Amino acid sequence: MSNLQEQLIALGGVFQAAVLVDRIARTGQASEANIGCMLGSLLVRDPKDTLEVFGGDDLNLRDGYRALIGALERDPNSLQREPLRYALSMLGLERQLNKRGDLLDTIGNRLPQIQSQAEHFGLVHENVIASSGALYQDTLSTLRQRIQVHGDMRFLQQPNNASKIRALLLAGIRAARLWRQLGGHRWQLVFSRRKLLNELYDMMRSPN
């Protein structure tokens, strides 16, 4: 797997989280499998490659890849505006987080507790989702930049949905951190658009 593919998998994770946030905000629905994959990505330690962070299967990131392709193609018909806004906001928040060692320490200290909960209850249990959402609230929500989520207030006001959205934003920012650690940079989205698209088209065509 090339470094560019690894970067695109991580960036696909950012966009996957963004798509799921948008879906929950607008419809109150997202599959447990998709949510579980993103929550699981928070807890993976020492993966053999980037894909293993997301369950070892590109299919888990298909919706994220599609949203990323839509953003890079700049086609108004395929552009998913809210997921793109969330994804770019997560990339920005990750850069702020990187300057805050205290918040990184808090996240590092509390993830093992969430891991224990997940082992006991299961990844998508409401306790695990609530703990992950609370970790986002106690750390990333304290930064100057905030992510404003737009959607149907009937769904946004439900505590479980709010926790899911925060937990997914935390997972998306973890993916953004991974992307940057792999050498990803926002300028690539502007100046290497065609190269990224060609690689993404190949990844979408491949069986895995």
Swiss-Prot record:
Keywords, ordered alphabetically: Cell inner membrane, Cell membrane, Cytoplasm, Membrane
Gene Ontology CC: one annotated term: cytoplasm
Membrane protein topology class: Peripheral membrane protein
Protein's cellular compartments: Cytoplasm; Cell inner membrane
Classification via InterPro entries: HflD (IPR007451), HflD-like_sf (IPR035932)
UniProt cross-references to Pfam families, sorted A to Z: DUF489 (PF04356)
Domain of life: Bacteria
Stated family: Belongs to the HflD family.
PANTHER family membership: HIGH FREQUENCY LYSOGENIZATION PROTEIN HFLD
HAMAP family attached to this UniProt entry: HflD_protein (MF_00695)
Protein name, as recorded: High frequency lysogenization protein HflD homolog
Source organism: Pseudomonas putida (strain ATCC 47054 / DSM 6125 / CFBP 8728 / NCIMB 11950 / KT2440)
Name of the encoding gene: hflD
